[in-house]
């Protein structure tokens, strides 16, 4: 039986920041000379982001004296321990909200969850996010727990792949996948082009999905297959390391160009001739979407959902592609039986791929069996 995403729930912090405001905030920092200010303004304006969410209220319109910003509006540089303490304080509640939204939308009781898979690369602790989901949602103590940490923006698809395999091994499994990222906890003043690019796109958010192989359940997205491609270049161009003053992002200008060169081969190998109806492309940034669109010769409307999520939420690392899938799941223009190809990019440089089929009408067990026989043939 085919595993299916029954629902996707999302949650964002209450503080929203407009792109032009956060652009001016970074440009006014005391270590910015005129050249850096011009680079900040050009980078932020080219991002095609209008707003983002953050767990840092001092970055909002009201401002204020906080851990990350002083009373004069200057960025502080808290150490990694303090940043991670904020992650431990704030991430579990955001995860709980997204997970509860997914359960409510699916109409699935918490007691039915058999497996939990959590994903995050912006903080760490033990007992970790997987433990907190079980405790905070009142799941059974016997719930199997798994955490995918520090994989980066591409981690949602490996988590969904794990869920699909749990369902294949245990047909009555009901898996809860939760991706939560608090990227803004690692902001810092810097004239480095890599850091300026990171500051211009990254944001905070959480997304959760309920997955089961029970074909009698409600409509959703069938998990058809997954793929991974490790490119021959890019190991030093996209990286995520732990420093003394937070986690440090390496994101060079070569990343979009590498993706542009590699994407056709990776996608052709994965799709093997299939032509998707719709696309869910992780918007690592506007230039990455542009390169994917050009490399795959896609029409502009093919990336509508990806660009809309980038515009309204920014890059929430692993959670972002789940927001895009949620948009496509709710989009009436994406009809029953439509195939959706998903792509996400992470350090390595790694391309994670996924193929989904949208199901508006529940598929019967007999039809599901016939579909698998057709694929096997």
What are these regions (language model features)?
Residues 1-86, 174, 183, 189-261, ...:
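Condensing-enzyme catalytic core mediating Claisen C-C bond formation in acyl metabolism
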Residues 1-2, 110-114, 141-144, 169-175, ...:
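Short coil/turn connectors at secondary-structure junctions
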Residues 43, 47-138, 274-289:
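Conserved beta-ketoacyl condensing-enzyme motif
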Residues 45, 49, 90-105, 162, ...:
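Short, well-ordered amphipathic alpha-helical segments that serve as non-catalytic structural scaffolds
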Residues 103, 121-123, 135, 140-142, ...:
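Claisen-condensing/thiolase-fold acyl-transfer catalytic domains that form or cleave C-C bonds
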Residues 125-131, 176-197, 227-243, 286-294, ...:
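Active-site-adjacent elements of ketosynthase-type condensing enzymes
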Residues 141-143, 148, 158-162, 179-204:
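Active-site glycine-rich loop that binds ribose-phosphate moieties when present
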């Amino acid at each position: 039986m085919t595993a299916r995403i029954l629902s996707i729930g999302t949650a964002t912090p209450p503080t929203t920041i407009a792109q032009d405001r956060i652009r001016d905030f970074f440009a006014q920092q005391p270590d910015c000379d005129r050249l850096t200010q011009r680079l900040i303004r050009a980078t932020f304006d080219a991002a095609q982001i209008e707003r983002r969410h953050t767990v840092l209220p001092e970055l909002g319109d009201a401002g204020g004296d906080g851990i990350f910003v002083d009373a004069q509006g200057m960025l502080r540089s808290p150490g990694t321990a303090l940043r991670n303490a904020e992650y431990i304080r704030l991430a579990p509640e955001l995860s709980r909200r997204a997970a509860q939204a997914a359960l409510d939308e699916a109409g699935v009781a918490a007691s039915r969850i058999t497996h939990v898979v959590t994903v995050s690369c912006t903080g760490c602790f033990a007992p970790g996010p997987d433990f907190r989901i079980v405790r905070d949602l009142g799941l059974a103590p016997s719930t199997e727990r798994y955490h995918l940490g520090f994989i980066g923006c591409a981690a949602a698809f490996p988590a969904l792949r794990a869920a699909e395999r749990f369902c294949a091994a245990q047909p009555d499994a009901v898996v809860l996948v939760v991706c939560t990222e608090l990227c803004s906890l690692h902001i810092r003043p810097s004239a480095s082009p890599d850091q300026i690019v990171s500051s211009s796109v990254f944001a905070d958010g959480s997304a959760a999905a309920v997955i089961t192989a029970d074909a009698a359940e409600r409509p959703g997205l069938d998990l058809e297959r997954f793929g991974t491609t490790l490119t021959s270049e890019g190991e030093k161009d996209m990286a995520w390391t732990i420093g003394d003053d937070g986690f440090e992002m390496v994101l060079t200008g070569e990343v979009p160009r590498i993706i542009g060169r590699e994407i056709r081969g990776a996608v052709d190998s994965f799709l093997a001739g299939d032509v998707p109806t719709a696309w869910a492309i992780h918007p690592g940034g506007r230039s990455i979407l542009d390169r994917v669109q050009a490399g795959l010769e896609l029409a502009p409307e093919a990336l509508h959902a990806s660009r809309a999520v980038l515009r309204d939420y920014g890059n929430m690392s692993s959670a972002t592609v789940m927001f895009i899938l949620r948009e496509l799941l709710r989009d009436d223009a994406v009809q029953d039986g439509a195939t959706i190809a998903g792509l996400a990019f992470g350090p390595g440089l790694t391309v994670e791929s996924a193929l989904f089929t949208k199901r508006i009408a529940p598929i019967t067990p007999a039809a599901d069996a016939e579909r698998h026989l057709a694929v096997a043939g």
